[in-house]
Amino acid sequence: MVQTAPSIFLSAALIALAYLIGSIPFAVVVSKLMGLQDPRSYGSKNPGATNVLRSGNKAAAALTLLGDAFKGWFALWLAQMLAPGLSWTVFALVALAAFLGHLYPVFLGFKGGKGVATALGILLAIHPGLALATAATWVIIAVFFRYSSLAALVAAFFAPVYYLFGSGVAWYAQGPVGVALAIITLLLFYRHRANIARLLAGTESRIGAKKK
C-alpha cells in the first residue's frame, strides 16, 4: 500500500494539510452550532469531548468525539488518496502533523485538546485492528478502574506495542510509523500530566462520579 516517496513539495503540502485538518476545533464548532457555552470557558477548559460532556449535552460530546476521531483518520486517508503509494516516512509525518494540529491548533491560538480521540482516528487509518485493540484496552481499564484519564494513558502506552507485535510489521519499511506512535504516546502523557499528578494524589475524578 504505502511504499514510494512523493516529491518534497507534495510531501510538505500533505503534512501542512494534515496539520490544518487536525486543527479543526470540533469541540468549539459543535458547541457553537448547538448553542452551548464555549468548552474553553468551563470545567477543565479543554476543547475536547470529555469537557463538552460536562455541559450535560451527551449528543454534543458524542459529535465532538466523532469529529476529533474523524479528522485523524481523514488526514491520513486524504494523503493516501492524493499521493497513492505514499512512503511510510511521509505517512508517519502526516499522522504526527494531524495529531499536533489537534494539540496545538492554529485556529485556537495553539491551545488545543489532549488528543485521545484524534489518536484513535489515526490508529484506525493505520489499521482497524490496531484501533480496535487500543479502544478495547481503554474500555477494560475504564470499566475496572473508573478513571478516563488512566484508561487513556494505558491505551496510549500499549498502542505502539500492539503495532510492534501485530500483523508482522516490517520494521525496515514501517519503522517510521512505530516511531510516530511512540511520539504520540509521549505527547499524550505530556498533555495528561495534570491528570497523572491527580491520579498519584488520589484526587482524580472517577467516571460517573458526582461533583460535591
Curated annotation (Swiss-Prot):
One of its GO terms (biological process) is phospholipid biosynthetic process. Its main location: membrane. The keyword Membrane applies. GO terms for molecular function: acyl-phosphate glycerol-3-phosphate acyltransferase activity. Keywords: Cell inner membrane, Cell membrane, Lipid biosynthesis, Lipid metabolism, Membrane, Phospholipid biosynthesis, Phospholipid metabolism, Transferase, Transmembrane, Transmembrane helix. It holds the Pfam family G3P_acyltransf. The chain crosses the membrane at residues 8-28, 59-79, 90-110, 122-142, 148-168, 169-189. It is an enzyme of class 2 (transferase). It is a multi-pass membrane protein. Disulfide bonds: none annotated. Pathway: Lipid metabolism; phospholipid metabolism. It is found in: Cell inner membrane. It catalyses: an acyl phosphate + sn-glycerol 3-phosphate = a 1-acyl-sn-glycero-3-phosphate + phosphate. InterPro entries: G3P_acylTferase_PlsY. Its EC number is 2.3.1.275. GO terms for cellular component: plasma membrane. Belongs to the PlsY family. Probably interacts with PlsX. HAMAP family: PlsY. Catalyzes the transfer of an acyl group from acyl-phosphate (acyl-PO(4)) to glycerol-3-phosphate (G3P) to form lysophosphatidic acid (LPA). This enzyme utilizes acyl-phosphate as fatty acyl donor, but not acyl-CoA or acyl-ACP. PANTHER family: GLYCEROL-3-PHOSPHATE ACYLTRANSFERASE-RELATED, INNER MEMBRANE PROTEIN YGIH. This is Glycerol-3-phosphate acyltransferase. It comes from Bordetella petrii (strain ATCC BAA-461 / DSM 12804 / CCUG 43448).
